[in-house]
Amino acid sequence: AFQRIDVARYPELTPTVTRYYRYSTGLAVVFRTESRNIRARWTTVNQLPGANSTLIAQRGLDLYIRRDGKWVFAGVGVPSKSGTQHEAPVVEHMDTTMKECLLYLPLHDEIAALEIGTDEGALLEAAPDPFRHRIVVIGSSITHGTSASRPGMAYAARLGRALGFGFVNLGASGQCKLDTFFARIAAETRADAFVFDTFSNPSAQQIDERLEGFVRRIRESHPTTPLIFLQTEVRESGNFDLKKRAFEDAKR
């Protein structure tokens, strides 16, 4: 299975966070091939469409190929409109030079199986991790990639390709409220730096009550690792909804 963390190690996770961390968000397969065509066959778990996600972002595939040192978009694996079995071309009609490929997995679904297909006789081999360092990002739907058009368009993935850094996406849409289990996950995770998008979901009261303990728990295991906290975004849903505006204003 392509899961972000071993959820069995964290029984204190809520059912929603457990489900989200089984998703393949931010995970990618790196390989080399000289094939002119690349296809994929994959199996997902959920059948219901997402309310704020494209079908490709939710359970499709997103391929990039390195050209002149840069990752360039190459194609998508479009999933079936219903069901959990998917098969589709990802890119076709290429030349036969050897290519380094980066295939992102779905943002909002769990992958039960994945097969990558090439032309008969074409070489297909695993490639080494192309990214240096390890930056772990824990956050809200913004980090998770909600409303991104494709799996590779979540900001953690975009930064990874642009900077050459390895970003680990631990976003949990709507759930990241400085809970102690997120602090435990960070404390037990190897990282060169942490980025926290942890002010978007909680209330001002939750931030006041939880932030100090959250940081203390992580610092016990990572005394010198950079902890980078992002400011919450401005929610345009509060342009006219006074309750939502007050909720956000209280955090500033």
What are these regions (language model features)?
Residues 57, 161, 221-223:
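Short, structurally constrained coil/turn elements
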Residues 70-75, 132-136, 166-170, 201, ...:
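Short C-terminal domain-edge/linker segments immediately following a structured domain
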